[in-house]
UniProtKB/Swiss-Prot annotation:
This is Kelch-like protein 40. Kelch repeats lie at residues 360-412, 413-462, 463-510, 512-557, 559-613. Residues 33-98 form the BTB domain. It is found in: Cytoplasm; Cytoplasm, Myofibril, Sarcomere, A band; Cytoplasm, Myofibril, Sarcomere, I band. Substrate-specific adapter of a BCR (BTB-CUL3-RBX1) E3 ubiquitin ligase complex that acts as a key regulator of skeletal muscle development. The BCR(KLHL40) complex acts by mediating ubiquitination and degradation of TFDP1, thereby regulating the activity of the E2F:DP transcription factor complex. Promotes stabilization of LMOD3 by acting as a negative regulator of LMOD3 ubiquitination; the molecular process by which it negatively regulates ubiquitination of LMOD3 is however unclear. The keyword Repeat applies. Belongs to the KLHL40 family. InterPro entries: BACK, BTB-kelch_protein, BTB/POZ_dom, Kelch-typ_b-propeller, Kelch_1, KLHL40_BTB/POZ_dom, SKP1/BTB/POZ_sf. Keywords: Cytoplasm, Developmental protein, Disease variant, Kelch repeat, Nemaline myopathy, Repeat, Ubl conjugation pathway. Residues 275-292 have a biased composition (Basic and acidic residues).
């Protein structure tokens, strides 16, 4: 049976191909042509039967004017678009690009050619981006294509804070704006962002446009979930906004929200229509009072402005992000829960990770063979984590492969600092590679004052700090320097009290804390703290065990220490380096380290970052 169906399908495709090829051949050789399509200054000879078979629009035109069926004038359609449509009807081939797809989409809608329409929808969906999502959304609404409009709206909601800054956002109609901001899928951490976007929209345009928008503002306001706004913001910003104060109806809505904050919920009666209203007057007199009250209660609805359903973006949590070659796992120390973020094996084993102040996560390291670069094909992986799709995105590879380097960020740039070459000789480096996040290009930055590897790089207030490590003589360094990208210069700071490499370090409570690591005499458990304002180092509570490669993470005001390597004695009495996967927390009040978890399996071979992630995008483990 299956073979029969397969054979029938094969025969059908063969006949379709034969028919289409034959029609195209007759078109190319000018055989049996009985129609001319005119668009602008160009003429396109073709076959009426082909147009009528593929398009209800053309069929209706031919049947409505049989005496003029040999000539068809198409107004307001460019000749190039007509040429592409006709080429597709005869060949099933169409060349889409960013410049032509919207015109082809509109033509397919007008001429009622569903196949071209579907191809354009798929093309636009796959290429949705910040620069075109609003235009695609409006196009989907204009052409009544729900699939495209919904896809574009979902993209806008996912990137709302960025899209709301676009000038095209201010050109939305009231209905288009409501379709976006009424969505539960809006990716905003705070409702304040929605309010501010609506106010910018209402105050934009010329005087006539502003007047029209302000008339629509009470309706638009129903989609702003003011009940999610803090009481202080409601009173200081919303209630005092000039556009709100100018409309008594908006002030009444704000008062309803303030009452709701105090526990007094306002409800509205649901309006009855037609017979329901008339029938209510003739209601059975024997209906009990309790039943009447129940019906009345059922007819009451909550005003839209009192909607307190959380948006998609409001499920962000501060988590410890553990990145390894096996995948990425997020750990919530407050609830002692783990979430799977990604099972991708794209991350190289020997990597360095970084989270920017905008909460973007990057990974660099490993070896990548770039076939396009004939002169120097060896480079390093450079990846960015996509929070929405929970996957790693390949970025332009790092041109200078190295190990034992550090990552820092400042002013929209990411810095790869120092390290050792992954080449013969493993030369120590003082070079600094700079990745521009706006142009997506690598370049060289100002070199370090000295060569270093096994150091730590930290970022704070658009400055890049380099601490410790080892020099070309393999001796540990206590040096510390800072790079100011505004001045394009490195400056040496006060040195650490203990020279060390492969240690843990983080910025915590405005200070830099370093702990454990390797010294010239072995492992250490010592820790010290650096005052950025005073440029001074002071002792800090030592870690309970001597370790190297300890990771320090500052998360929501709490300092954590994770993993690392310690020298442990085996059953045979031999001392061997052993990786530990435990988690410790520093007790600020008692000034001591406390154990949190003896072992967390996902920490093996991982790097650790404090990241804000949406738990709705993650899978609880």
């Amino acid at each position: 049976m299956a073979l029969g169906l397969e054979q029938a399908e094969e025969q059908r495709l063969y006949q379709q191909t034969l028919l289409q090829d034959g029609l195209k051949d007759m078109l190319d050789h000018g055989k049996f042509l009985d129609c001319v399509v005119r668009a602008g200054e160009r003429e396109f000879p073709c076959h009426r039967l082909v147009l009528a078979a593929c398009s209800p629009y053309f069929r209706a035109r031919f049947l409505a004017e049989p005496e003029r069926a040999g000539e068809l004038h198409l107004e307001e359609v460019s000749p190039d678009v007509v040429a592409q449509v006709l080429h597709y009807l005869y060949t099933s081939e169409i060349a889409l690009d960013e410049a032509s797809v919207q015109d082809l989409f509109a033509a397919a809608h007008r001429f009622q050619i569903p196949s071209i329409f579907t191809i354009c929808v798929s093309f636009l969906q796959k290429r949705l981006c910040l620069s075109n999502c609003l235009a695609v959304f409006r196009l989907g609404l204009l052409l009544d294509c729900a699939r495209l409009a919904v896809a574009a709206r979902d993209f806008i909601c996912a990137h709302f804070t960025l899209v709301a800054r676009d000038a095209d956002f201010l050109g939305l109609s009231a209905d288009e704006l409501i379709a976006i901001i009424s969505s539960d899928g809006l990716n905003v951490e705070k409702e304040e962002a929605v309010f501010e976007a609506v106010m910018r929209w209402a105050g934009s345009g010329d005087a006539e446009a502003q007047a029209e928008r302000q008339r629509a503002l009470p309706t638009v306001f129903e989609s702003v979930r003011c009940r999610l706004l803090p009481r202080a913001f409601l009173e200081s910003r919303v209630e005092r906004h000039p556009l709100v104060r100018a409309q008594p109806e908006l002030l009444r809505k704000v008062q309803m929200v303030k009452d709701a904050h105090e526990g007094r919920i306002t409800t509205l009666r649901k309006k009855k229509k037609g017979k329901d209203g008339a029938g209510a007057k003739e209601a059975d007199k024997g209906t009990s009072k309790a039943k009447a009250e129940e019906d009345e209660e059922a007819e009451r609805i909550l005003p839209g402005i009192l909607n307190d359903t959380l948006r998609f973006g409001m499920f962000l949590q501060d988590l410890i992000f553990m990145i390894s070659e096996e995948g990425a796992v997020a750990y919530d120390p407050a609830a002692n829960e783990c979430y799977c973020a990604s099972l991708s094996n794209q991350v190289p084993k020997n990597h360095v990770s970084l989270v920017t102040k905008e909460n973007q996560v990057f990974v660099a390291g490993g070896l990548f063979y770039n076939e396009d670069n004939k002169e120097d094909p060896m480079s390093a992986y450079f990846l960015q984590f996509d929070h929405l799709d929970s996957e790693w995105l390949g970025m332009p590879p790092l041109p200078s492969p190295r190990c034992l380097f550090g990552l820092g960020e400042a002013l929209n740039s990411i810095y790869v600092v120092g390290g050792r070459e992954i080449k013969d000789g493993e030369r120590c480096l003082d070079s600094v590679m700079c990745y521009d996040r706006l142009s997506f290009k690598w370049g060289e930055s100002d070199p370090l004052p000295y060569v270093v590897y096994g150091h730590t790089v930290l970022s704070h207030m658009d400055l890049v700090y380099v601490i410790g490590g080892k020099g070309s003589d393999r001796k540990c360094l206590n040096k510390m320097c800072v790079y100011d990208p505004k001045k394009f210069e490195w400056k040496e700071l006060a040195p650490m009290q203990t020279a060390r490499s492969l240690f843990g370090a983080t910025v915590h409570d405005g200070r830099i804390i370093v702990a454990a690591g390797v010294t010239d005499t072995g492992l250490t458990s010592s820790a010290e703290v650096y005052s950025i304002t005073d440029n001074k180092w002071a002792p800090f509570e030592a870690f309970p065990q001597e370790r190297s490669s300890l990771s320090l993470v500052s998360l929501v005001g709490t300092l954590y220490a994770i993993g690392g390597f310690a020298t442990l004695e085996t059953e045979s009495g031999e001392l061997v380096p052993t990786e530990l996967n435990d988690i410790w927390r520093y007790n600020e009040e008692e000034k001591k380290w406390e154990g949190v978890l003896r072992e967390i399996a996902y920490a093996a071979g991982a790097t650790f970052l404090p990241v804000r992630l949406n738990v709705l995008c993650l899978t609880k483990m």
